[in-house]
Amino acid sequence: MKIRDAYTIVTCPGRNFVTLKIVTESGTHGIGDATLNGREMAVAAYLDEHVVPALIGRDAGRIEDTWQYLYRGAYWRRGPVTMTAIAAVDMALWDIKAKAAGMPLYQLLGGKSRERVMTYAHCTGQTIEDCLGEVARHVELGYRAVRVQSGVPGIETTYGVAKTPGERYEPADSSLPAEHVWSTEKYLNHAPKLFAAVRERFGDDLHVLHDVHHRLTPIEAARLGKAVEPYHLFWLEDCVPAENQESLRLIREHTTTPLAIGEVFNSIHDCRELIQNQWIDYIRMPLTHGGGITAMRRVADLASLYHVRTGFHGPTDLSPVCLGAAIHFDTWVPNFGIQEHMPHTDETDAVFPHDYRFEDGHFLAGESPGHGVDIDEELAAKYPYERASLPVNRLEDGTLWHW
């Protein structure tokens, strides 16, 4: 099962996606997601210049060996660009192997650990009342879990909140980074009020999640975690910048609120101490940025030893290829927690036809061989790349801060 061809496809059906397609001599093909939000062309260039030439002629069935070749052989290890490129190759090779075996990916991984995959929706609003309306709408759609974000009084732009009701939230909206103003004090005073309102309106049975998006210092995060304990959050996500793993120890010592982190991680070494010391409850590193299925199996296996569960990052800046592969992984992995779900646009779904489906607050993996997602290259070509950048944050005094 030699690799005959490999190439990248860059398309923008509403937002940019990078896809790697690998074709074997028998004609079987697999695809992998190589999207890195705001740095898409860096990964595409890495693949085109350094990875694709090395794939031609290799045995597509030797997934582990290829992963090690791309990781160890590069010398410059880890980092988001390298690991996203490796993940795309890995995802495509698992797709090919499952197709060759004639089985859906979850079967090749070891079979089902569950019948369906619980997801959480994003519920936002400029005001708490607007957010509550979105929660009600998603509960009607069958969701048992929601991530809630609302505008903070006195802050013009708040992370995760669309500019107008019903609009999709898309932070990468200009060719150069937009600058937003952030106030930790105003946020900390406001956030508990949001959770109190959700619990008062919807009771205790609904799973409630919240994303801080790396904005706080460790002691500020500890204060927030303690303050929201009465509202029994499913998790508090990315409450501090991810580089300082020791900060999670301090937060853990101050609060029983479950902690989730990892969407900007790229390697098992980014989360090893967090898992082994049980400073977190959920690991969120996505397949696309964490080195693919091969690497994330190792992360999940390690996490299972310490009662840490998966909660994969799943926004619309990762393509349906990543989501499809993640749903198969979620269906198999024993220590599954939850899967993020932000619906893609109709244009994106048309470019990436898939057989996974959403039903009553859950995803169901498809039964076709592989991960069940393909790409319509002719349609993809109609949506050329459009440069876009994520915003940056400044404090009210002008100091650059974490976005």
From Swiss-Prot:
Its cofactor is Mg(2+). The record marks P315 as: Important for activity and substrate specificity. Keywords: Lyase, Magnesium, Metal-binding. It is an enzyme of class 4 (lyase). Substrate binds at N37, H122, E263, R284, H313, D317, E340. InterPro entries: D-mannonate_dehydratase-like, D-mannonate_dehydratase_GalD, DgoD-like, Enolase-like_C_sf, Enolase-like_N, Enolase_C-like, Mandel_Rmase/mucon_lact_enz_CS, Mandelate_racemase_C. One of its GO terms (molecular function) is mannonate dehydratase activity. Mg(2+) binds at D211, E237, E263. It catalyses: D-mannonate = 2-dehydro-3-deoxy-D-gluconate + H2O; D-gluconate = 2-dehydro-3-deoxy-D-gluconate + H2O. One of its GO terms (biological process) is amino acid catabolic process. It comes from the Bacteria. Its EC number is 4.2.1.-, 4.2.1.39, 4.2.1.8. The active site is at Y159 (proton donor/acceptor), H213 (proton donor/acceptor). Pfam families: MR_MLE_C, MR_MLE_N. Binds 1 Mg(2+) ion per subunit. PROSITE patterns: MR_MLE_1. Belongs to the mandelate racemase/muconate lactonizing enzyme family. GalD subfamily. This is D-galactonate dehydratase family member ManD.
